[in-house]
């Protein structure tokens, strides 16, 4: 029976179809300009950019220029790149310009689509960011497309790992900047730790087009970007708290092995409060008062170290160090450390040397970074399954763009086996059969370990003609993936490997030409070689087509339907034939999630023998339902995390905006005076309560406060004895005395130096307090979940207490700045910019947990063991705070680094 919704869709088309149809009139208008645009000379075509910019200056909008600008960009693409965007690609570009997500299938030319929207938006001169998932793709796309943009008179920059600030600033100043999501986020964080506007590298967040938008804004968004630096040594605190845990009895705490959590009972909390009070570590009455957030965090870590972490199972002690053992592989992981002080708690437990913990200096999630752009758009082959998330979190619509040619790929029903071994044996049989008939095969796995296991089983079966590909070496993997369409090729790859590279039947022409013609001089020999490669690929493509096109074999279903669709979408590009099939077992992760035991007994009743598979559309539907449940759960988790991060984000925006204002302001004196006046008012209000008698005034406290914060010795006692004196009179006299003293100092220093001093003091104090605040919020977040047991909403509690902590930060800021400015003395020397702290960037891969930034080595970095102390030429780039390689024992900046500065 056809539903009413189905009848309506047949009559009027779906919302997506109506949206796509709405672009038809504009496409017709662009096509109508094609002949006239073709008739222009190269110079006249390039001159259109200046003409468009003038029209914008005269009041036209980008929307007004869309039709002529797209016509110009299309013609320039035809001349420079020898590619003419199809009508469906114009549709995709209009979706991007409109600030939405264009879902375009693999092979539909997303990179080319972006150029049209990029060109139009770059005309405004505010910068366009094209965001990719790795350095290789950023460099590749920038190198290819800069020819097109350069022809049209626009500049292109690229941001990858290892660039210095000057190179980054130059790249961001270009009309168009290609960059990875990680580099953009870290540059934003680093910029907001600088002390001078001229030191910053980014110039705003105008318009971004995110390639592989689902990967960056959904998958990668589960883990934040963090910049950390070393903290002060707190070994004594860890050792003191560690000594408390053995004094507790089993009734004092509750352990949940499954959830890996440890909590204190009421008796345990009481016992700890007494111990902490004796040690002078407890503030206030209760352990769970807001002032004790950090102590609670340390105590919880100590309890986990003793009761949840087992020596020689979770970690070993080697060479006076704690070395983590991977719970899945059983391998040691030297160099990896638990975060949030947990590693230090283990070091205290085992009585080894406690290494200083790293402090988060700054952090941001991708959700909050990308929401800063005035306009955001994205492209991917698979976004519709996450449409709700894109709409809710980013305000982005997902619009499916029709393919240029109909999809001919056959998606077969899943085959389900009882065990993983049976499944892999069936896959090996299928791979060999496809290889025999010359059909290219791409085998998708969910992890590097599964890839290695299948490769091992293939070799054992006597088959060695295959490539294994893991998402680690982007340039090498791009080449292997590009050749996976050669007849008979067998490529085993993790789902995420080779993103951004098309698998073309017969092989990728461009990749082969680039690799095989490298270093050849232009001439007849090069032309002949190029013609031979093109002819060979044409023959190979015909063979691959005759064998049925690319065959995608998936070894497991992923938690997300989107990842499965990505893998399927590798086959059947641009109307080519292809096949896809999923091989599953009841031991797969997803099957276990939704009750494989029940299914196992059911399959046995059906008489399923070893090595046999069940194939039925019902299985596919059941799996899809399970995937939808998991997707919904993951979305809820991300949404919940974002609610907490939004609290920090609102505060981050206030602090970063304040910093920017201070850096750009010509005169800071007014800000400093406002802070001073608020401190004075708070002091007087605290020690002289409203409507209190003179006998109730705390004159001694007021005098001490004035000395502490204002560096003044005022005759407050005499003032208090005067007949009819009121609190307002005291406030006025203290304010006048402080203002006079501050004015004298400003006159002595001179306006220029005073402004510099005020700016430096305020910025450095903000940074110091903000770092402490981030740590406090981290600690608060780690314990606030327990409020749920008391029937209180943890999120509301977190918001309220985070606000209290922020108010406290602002009070501390005013007091610290005032106290410092009223004491600072001028030493005759050239003012120097405050040094930035040592910084390390981290972004954990949400799937593997590996630190993506740990693999990058800064440009020109030389390992210490390869440096010759007597030959500075062998030292490479050296951090200013590193020990000098010459062996003097001094920091580089105080030794050989002095010559660089001179």
Curated annotation (Swiss-Prot):
InterPro entries: Helicase_ATP-bd, Helicase_C-like, P-loop_NTPase, SEC_C_motif, SecA, SecA_CS, SecA_DEAD, SecA_motor_DEAD
Annotated positions binding ATP: 89, 107-111, 502
EC code(s) of this entry: 7.4.2.8
Biological processes, Gene Ontology terms: intracellular protein transmembrane transport; protein import; protein secretion by the type II secretion system; protein targeting; protein transport by the Sec complex
Cofactor: binding comment: May bind 1 zinc ion per subunit.
Cofactor entry: Zn(2+)
Residues at which Zn(2+) binds: 884, 886, 895-896
GO cellular component, one term: cytosol
One GO MF term attached to the UniProt entry: ATP binding
Pfam families: P-loop_SecA, SEC-C, SecA_DEAD, SecA_PP_bind, SecA_SW
Membrane topology: Peripheral membrane protein
Task performed by this protein: Part of the Sec protein translocase complex. Interacts with the SecYEG preprotein conducting channel. Has a central role in coupling the hydrolysis of ATP to the transfer of proteins into and across the cell membrane, serving both as a receptor for the preprotein-SecB complex and as an ATP-driven molecular motor driving the stepwise translocation of polypeptide chains across the membrane.
NCBIfam families assigned: PRK12904.1, secA
The protein's assembly and partners: Monomer and homodimer. Part of the essential Sec protein translocation apparatus which comprises SecA, SecYEG and auxiliary proteins SecDF-YajC and YidC.
Protein name as annotated: Protein translocase subunit SecA
Organism: Agrobacterium fabrum (strain C58 / ATCC 33970) (Agrobacterium tumefaciens (strain C58))
Gene: secA
């Amino acid at each position: 029976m056809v539903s009413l919704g189905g009848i309506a869709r047949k009559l009027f088309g779906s919302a997506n179809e109506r949206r796509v149809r709405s672009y038809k009139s504009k496409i017709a208008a662009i096509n109508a300009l094609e002949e006239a645009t073709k008739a222009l000379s190269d110079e006249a075509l390039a001159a259109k950019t200046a003409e468009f910019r003038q029209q914008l200056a005269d009041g036209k909008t980008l929307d007004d220029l869309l039709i002529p600008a797209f016509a110009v960009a299309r013609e320039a693409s035809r001349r420079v790149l020898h590619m003419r965007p199809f009508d469906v690609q114009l549709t995709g570009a209009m979706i991007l310009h409109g600030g939405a997500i264009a879902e375009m299938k693999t092979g539909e030319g997303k990179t080319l689509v972006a150029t049209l929207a990029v060109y139009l938006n770059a005309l405004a001169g505010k910068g366009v960011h094209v965001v990719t998932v790795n350095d290789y793709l950023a460099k590749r796309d920038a190198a290819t497309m800069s020819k097109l943009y350069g022809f049209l008179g626009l500049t292109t920059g690229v941001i990858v790992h290892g660039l210095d600030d000057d190179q980054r600033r130059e790249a961001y100043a270009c009309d168009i900047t290609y960059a990875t999501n990680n580099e953009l986020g870290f540059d934003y964080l680093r910029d907001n730790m600088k002390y001078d506007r001229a030191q910053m590298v980014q110039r705003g967040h105008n318009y971004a087009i995110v390639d592989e938008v689902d990967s960056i804004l959904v998958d990668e968004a589960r883990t934040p970007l963090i910049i950390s630096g070393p903290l002060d040594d707190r070994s004594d605190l860890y050792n003191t708290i560690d000594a408390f845990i053995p004094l507790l009895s089993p009734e004092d705490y509750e352990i949940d092995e499954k959830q890996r959590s440890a909590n204190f009972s009421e008796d345990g909390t009481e016992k700890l409060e007494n111990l902490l009070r004796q040690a002078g570590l407890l503030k206030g009455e209760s352990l769970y008062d807001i002032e004790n957030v950090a102590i609670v965090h340390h105590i919880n870590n100590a309890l986990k170290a003793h009761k949840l972490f087992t020596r020689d199972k979770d970690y070993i002690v080697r060479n006076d160090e704690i070395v983590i053992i991977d719970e899945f592989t059983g391998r040691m992981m030297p160099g990896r450390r638990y975060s949030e002080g947990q590693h230090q708690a283990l070091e205290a437990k085992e009585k080894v040397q406690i290494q200083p913990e790293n402090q988060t200096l700054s952090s941001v999630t991708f959700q909050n970074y990308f929401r800063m752009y005035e306009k955001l758009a994205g492209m991917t082959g698979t976004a519709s399954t996450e449409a709700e998330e894109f709409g809710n979190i980013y305000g982005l619509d997902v619009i499916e763009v029709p393919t240029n040619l109909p999809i001919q790929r056959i998606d077969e029903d899943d085959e389900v086996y009882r065990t993983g071994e049976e499944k892999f044996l069936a896959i090996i049989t299928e791979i060999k059969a496809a290889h025999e008939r010359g059909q290219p095969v791409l085998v998708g796995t969910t992890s590097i370990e599964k890839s290695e296991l299948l490769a091992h089983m293939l070799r054992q079966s006597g088959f060695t003609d295959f490539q294994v590909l893991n998402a680690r070496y982007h340039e090498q993997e791009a080449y292997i993936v590009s050749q996976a369409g050669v007849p008979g090729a067998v490529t085993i790859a993790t789902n995420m490997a080779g993103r951004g590279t098309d698998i073309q039947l017969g092989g990728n022409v461009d990749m082969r030409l680039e690799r095989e013609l490298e270093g050849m001089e232009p001439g007849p020999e090069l032309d002949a070689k190029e013609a031979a490669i093109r002819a060979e690929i044409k023959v190979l493509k015909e063979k691959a087509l005759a064998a049925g096109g690319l065959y995608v074999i998936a070894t497991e279903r992923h938690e997300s339907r989107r990842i499965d669709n990505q893998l399927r979408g590798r086959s059947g590009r641009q109307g080519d034939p292809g096949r896809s099939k999923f091989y599953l077992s009841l031991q797969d992760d997803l099957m276990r999630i939704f009750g494989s035991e029940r299914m196992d007994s059911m399959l046995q009743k059906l008489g399923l023998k070893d090595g046999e598979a069940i194939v039925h559309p019902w299985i596919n539907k059941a799996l899809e339902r399970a995937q939808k449940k998991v997707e919904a759960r993951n979305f809820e988790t991300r949404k919940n995390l974002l609610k907490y991060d939004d609290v920090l984000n609102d505060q981050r925006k206030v602090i970063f905006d304040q910093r920017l204002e201070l850096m750009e302001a010509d005169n800071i004196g007014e800000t400093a005076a406002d802070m001073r006046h608020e401190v004075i008012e708070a002091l007087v209000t605290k020690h002289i309560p409203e409507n209190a008698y003179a006998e109730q005034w705390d004159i001694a406290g007021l005098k001490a406060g004035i000395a502490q914060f204002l560096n003044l010795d005022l005759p407050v006692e005499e003032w208090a004895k005067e007949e009819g004196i009121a609190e307002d009179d005291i406030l006025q006299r203290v304010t006048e005395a402080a203002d006079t003293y501050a004015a004298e100092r400003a006159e002595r220093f001179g306006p220029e130096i005073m402004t510099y001093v005020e700016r430096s003091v305020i910025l450095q104090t903000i940074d110091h307090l903000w770092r402490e605040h981030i740590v406090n919020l981290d600690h608060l977040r780690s314990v606030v979940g327990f409020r749920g047991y008391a029937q209180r909403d943890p999120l509301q509690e977190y918001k309220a207490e985070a606000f209290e902590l922020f108010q406290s930060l602002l009070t501390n800021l005013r007091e610290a700045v005032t106290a410092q400015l009223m004491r600072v003395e001028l030493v005759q020397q050239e003012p120097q910019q405050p040094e930035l702290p040592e910084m390390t960037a981290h972004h954990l891969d949400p799937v593997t947990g590996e630190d993506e930034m740990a693999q990058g080595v800064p440009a020109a970095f030389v390992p210490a063991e390869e440096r010759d102390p007597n030959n500075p030429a062998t030292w490479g780039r050296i951090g200013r705070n590193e020990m000098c390689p010459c062996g003097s024992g001094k920091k580089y900046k105080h030794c050989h680094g002095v010559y660089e500065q001179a």
